[in-house]
């Protein structure tokens, strides 16, 4: 029996169960945090995504929503560089510790958790919190960047380019103990993460991907294979042998900058709208999505109000597609169609209306 055949049957079973279930329980957490990098404005990402109509869109899909609001992270008054390079380590560590607690609580209460960033260093907290209740989770990381530098390989010092290194078990002897990071326990293995959309990878990151057998699909791979084949292979790798919760960590800069201009590290040659929506739709169709991060929307970097709105609207589309919106139209599932009333009944109703 082929793996492809088994996976096809698994997905058909999951899709059937999804169609039978019209309501997702979704917790929405705003994480207005920017200290994993140096550019201001990404802390306004959650507000921009909300203003673009996220809650209304999820409601229209039949989701049962719990809004945790926007978190207020504890400020760290004196946060010196680590090793004369790493920026805001104590702030990043503490914010992620606080975020992990909220994500953990939401997942334990039975919600699929949506975290609105904020910069991508927040994935340390979201994945750590998720893993407390779903230790066998797998990660689909959609991004222009691998975000797998260690504090010893980074050239920028920005922790939003390093979150995966703190989470990966295989890298722990390569990662120094940063102030504020003592609470973090590595919770994923190299076989439990797949990257999609890479096109700006630092040399040390490329070394890590190759030498630690981490699977990735660059934009060149997407051009060569097509997004359908990329998703088939992603699911073969992550859920082909067993069903397990999926954590989707989606950086808006995975898209081409013509679609998502309001972000801090845009890279030309990114995902098209159709490719991005296909990724989200296919993850929804597995029925295994358990948590989602949507990060790096920075309205302050837009050159116009239109650019800010376009980027936030795109973020809403990704999230909605992950919870059942389709390009044929997102609809609440009907058990049956209404039938016409009998002629007598219709006549009586007509008289009443008159």
Swiss-Prot record:
InterPro entries: Arginase, Ureohydrolase, Ureohydrolase_dom_sf, Ureohydrolase_Mn_BS
CC cofactor note: Binds 2 manganese ions per subunit.
Tissue: Expressed most strongly in kidney and prostate, much less strongly in the brain, skeletal muscle, placenta, lung, mammary gland, macrophage, uterus, testis and gut, but apparently not in the liver, heart and pancreas. Expressed in activated T cells.
PANTHER family: ARGINASE, ARGINASE-2, MITOCHONDRIAL
CDD domains reported in the protein's UniProt record: Arginase (cd09989)
Disordered, as annotated region: 334-354
Annotated protein name in UniProt: Arginase-2, mitochondrial
Biological classification of the source: Eukaryota, Metazoa, Chordata, Craniata, Vertebrata
One Gene Ontology term from the biological process aspect of the record: adaptive immune response
Organism: Homo sapiens
Cleaved signal peptide residues: none
Keyword line: Adaptive immunity, Arginine metabolism, Hydrolase, Immunity, Innate immunity, Manganese, Metal-binding, Mitochondrion, Transit peptide, Urea cycle
